[in-house]
Amino acid sequence: MAPQKPETFMLSTEAQQALPHDAQVALQQVDNLKYFLISAPVDWQPDQYIRRFLLPTGEYVSCVLWNNLFHISGTDIVRCLSFRFQAFGRPVKNSKKFEEGIFSDLRNLKSGTDASLEEPKSAFLDFLYKNNCIRTQKKQKVFYWYSVPHDRLFLDALERDLKREKMGQEATTVAVSEPALSFQYDSSQSLYEQLTKTQQANSSSFSAQQPAFPPGQSSSPVMRNMDAMPRPI
């Protein structure tokens, strides 16, 4: 059973299969990005400090090794989310307001546990700036790679805009193509809660269909590897 994606979990299976080819290609590109977000810190060379991923928008997202920890900048997080909204069929039309919302959400990630708080023009910020990972060297948090809840950030930003539209206010993104045009918003609970429940229901259904294995034995080496992954995104 295919995992539920934040971009399409509100659509029926039939609707997902009926998506236009362009939409399916765009969502596959999102999957490619997600794979990078999971796997980027693996298999680095001894003298390697940065690994890049080229987004279809032409911008790069970078995984940066500094002080033996892998990091991602707030600027690159926004780049990831801007691309995901474009692939979803809801491109960003008010970049400043969109970015402000994301950085407001990122305040929930605390220095020391989820991020490194860098002083202005520190050696780390200088490296990030020279590699186009940040736009300014002012004091800021740089986030630990596996501490960033990318799906949650996407859904929270989407929910903000859907609520704005429902109240007749200007949203930061606009639905222009599928699957965004078919996305049905239920305001009785948060999108993240709805996605979590859908994933749990699918997981329970999937587990019920699987043969029993002895304790400690996984049915798949892929599942064993995923079990060992640091905090899921």
Locations of regions flagged by a protein language model:
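Proline/serine/threonine-rich intrinsically disordered activation/regulatory regions
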Residues: 1-75, 169-233
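Generic signal for short, ordered secondary-structure residues
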Residues: 12, 60, 64, 81, ...
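Homeobox/homeodomain signature
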Residues: 23-27, 88, 107, 124
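Beta-strand-rich binding-surface signature
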Residues: 27, 34, 47-52, 58-61, ...
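Charged/polar, solvent-exposed surface patches and flexible loops
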Residues: 28, 35, 39, 79, ...
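Short, amphipathic alpha-helical interface elements at domain boundaries
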Residues: 61-97
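Chromatin/DNA-recognition segments of nuclear transcriptional regulators
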Residues: 95-182
